[in-house]
Design a protein with these regions (language model features):
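Active-site cleft segment of glycoside hydrolase catalytic domains centered on the general acid/base Glu
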Residues: 190-208
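Aromatic- and acid-rich polysaccharide-binding/catalytic face
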Residues: 177, 181-182, 282-285
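Active-site beta->alpha N-cap acidic-glycine motif
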Residues: 61-178, 185-189, 212, 219-253, ...
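Active-site-adjacent pocket scaffolds in enzyme catalytic domains
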Residues: 44-65, 143-159, 226-341, 392-404, ...
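N-terminal pre-catalytic segment of deacetylase/amide-hydrolase enzymes
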Residues: 3-7, 11-14, 18, 24-97, ...
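Ser/Thr/Gly/Pro-rich low-complexity, disordered linker/stalk segments of secreted
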Residues: 43-53, 428-514
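C-terminal domain-boundary segment and adjacent tail
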Residues: 68-74, 78-79, 125, 262-274, ...
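Well-ordered, non-membrane alpha-helical segments in soluble/globular domains
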Residues: 109-111, 158-166, 202-207, 323-332, ...
Length: 514
């Protein structure tokens, strides 16, 4: 079981506005979910061709890396290839389900949602915290920026927890899912939090996150007999989400020199992503919160704080309603993209049993409803980035002019019919891509629509996670709660259709804390 601690943050309200924190999961508290295997259809998303299953690779095909904690085993299996849109073709509806601080504990939620993904032909992104592969007795190997060696706001792990997490990471990758990073110690706020780190400090944090994944056999000698992780993490790691959604600017400046191709640490609206400083900026999104006068971030923790405040186990009589509210909000968000601009829907989650596990139920029901629809692809961030890179830059430029829920007035065939689909051949394989598509980046800057600017969080020095109206969201508190998971990610909830902050129409009827 993961030995993690959690720092709970209080919500902040300015007048009638609610500043909500996006949570980050470690080991949860309460509840349990079975690790069901689901039904493996062995097909790509709605018939897309996949790389062949890896199975048991011949010994001579496995190239151990370093101490044998990781290995090169060939192209990732079960990963559909990215294809360029034909002229006039309607874009797929992408949906990304992602998990912050992914690790397997006694709740068995990692294994459970692997089964859910297989059942509904979904691929997902698991943002692994590096310290979840570092045992408590070796904690001094972690040298966090601006903190003493061995310090972590989410604790470390034990041998059993490391073994279980490795098993899930190994299986997830072989099933075509992505292993990203949530970095290490999860420090938030003004006192040495990630939002205060320099570019060089971020480079150190990224290097250490990689090192813990690449050296778990050395650091946990009891597990030397375990199979290696079947990938080269230096090549596998292409994206992240920062703790508390802080520090994005300097993190990206560091990460872009270390092979990263995307980041999901921002706050935005349901519009098509663009590149920022050569990296795809694919933020969490503001989505409807049924019955409320404002929208909330597309993450389970944000719904929870708007419902039960910072109490992770609120009124049991409200649990079912709260889960339904989250599910219905996500489904409304899906519908306005699916029937509108087809912008990818980005959803963040945590392996937690907050409010009796109601958010896990909500996510599972959402997956079941959206991933089975025609034209929908439930993909990892890697797959989404591959698809974006494969497109004609002029096509992407037109897509970015569409506002939230805005379908082309003349229809997709006419709207995208003038694009030259054969301008350059799409890459055959999604497993590896190199370099920055400068043409795509420049093309996506053209024709910015009136709604495109909505939801773009403005970076300031140490300014991520600001409350609506300019007030800073409160940093996580300092008193750890035993075995409660990670500190929450910070991000503001906004009034509908404006990620930069508008006043709520009235008091928050659900009683979110202020």
């Amino acid at each position: 079981m993961m030995a993690a601690t959690k720092r709970i943050a209080s919500g902040v309200m300015s007048t009638a506005l609610v500043a909500v924190l996006a949570g980050c999961s470690g080991s949860g508290s309460g509840g349990s979910a079975s690790g069901g295997a689901g039904v493996d259809t062995e097909k790509g998303a709605h018939g897309a061709k996949e790389n062949p299953p890896a199975g048991a690779a011949p010994k001579n095909a496995i190239k151990l890396i370093g101490d044998g904690s990781t290995a090169f085993t060939g192209v990732q299996p079960k990963l559909p290839a990215a294809k360029r849109l034909a002229a006039g073709e309607k874009p797929p509806q992408f949906v990304v389900f992602s998990w912050d601080g992914a690790g397997e504990d006694s709740q068995k939620l990692f294994s459970h949602f692997r089964g859910v993904a297989k059942k509904y032909n979904a691929k997902m992104t698991y943002f692994l915290s590096g310290v979840y592969l570092l045992p408590e007795e070796k904690k001094d190997l972690y040298n966090p920026p601006q903190h003493a060696p061995g310090r972590s706001d989410i604790g470390f792990n034990d041998t059993g927890g490391i073994r279980d997490t490795l098993a899930e990471v190994r299986a997830a990758w072989l099933e075509g899912n992505e292993i990203g990073t949530h970095f290490n110690g999860h420090f938030c706020g003004a006192d040495g939090g990630v939002g205060t780190w320099s570019v060089d400090e971020w480079k150190s944090e990224i290097s250490q996150a990689k090192a813990f994944v690449k050296s778990w056999k050395t650091n946990t000698p009891e597990l030397k007999g375990e199979a290696p992780l079947p990938f080269d993490y230096d090549k596998e790691l292409i994206g992240a989400r920062t703790p508390c959604l802080e520090g994005q600017k300097n993190m990206v400046a560091a990460a872009r020199t270390m092979g990263f191709r995307y980041d999901s640490s921002g706050v935005g609206n349901q519009v098509w992503p663009k590149k920022k400083d050569g990296v795809w900026d694919i933020p969490l999104q503001l989505v409807p919160m049924p019955g409320r006068a404002f929208e909330t971030l597309s993450m389970d923790y944000n719904f929870m704080v708007n419902q039960s405040g910072t109490a992770t186990q609120g009124d049991p009589s409200q649990h079912e309603y709260w889960g339904n509210q989250m599910r219905d909000g996500l489904l409304q968000a899906f519908d306005r993209s699916y029937n509108g601009n087809r912008a990818p829907l980005i959803i963040g989650n945590h392996f937690e049993s907050w409010n009796g596990g109601t958010y896990m139920r909500a996510i599972e029901e959402t997956i079941a409803q959206v991933c089975t629809k025609e034209g929908v692809r439930c993909v990892s961030f890697r797959q989404l980035a591959d698809w974006l890179d494969a497109q004609d830059p002029r096509t992407l430029a037109k897509l970015t002019t569409l506002g939230v829920g805005e379908a082309p007035k003349t229809g997709w065939s006419s709207y995208l019919g003038t694009q030259q689909a054969a301008a350059r051949p799409a890459d055959k394989e999604t497993g590896t891509r190199t370099g920055t598509d400068k043409d795509t980046e420049k093309g996506s800057e053209k024709g910015q629509g009136k709604d495109q600017g909505r939801g773009q969080e403005q970076e300031q020095d140490g300014g991520e996670g600001q409350a609506p109206g300019g007030g800073a969201a409160e940093a996580p508190g300092q008193a750890p709660a035993e075995d409660a998971g990670e500190a929450p990610d910070q991000a503001p909830d906004q009034a509908p259709g404006n990620a930069s902050g508008q006043e709520d129409a009235g008091p928050d009827p659900a009683g979110a804390t202020g």
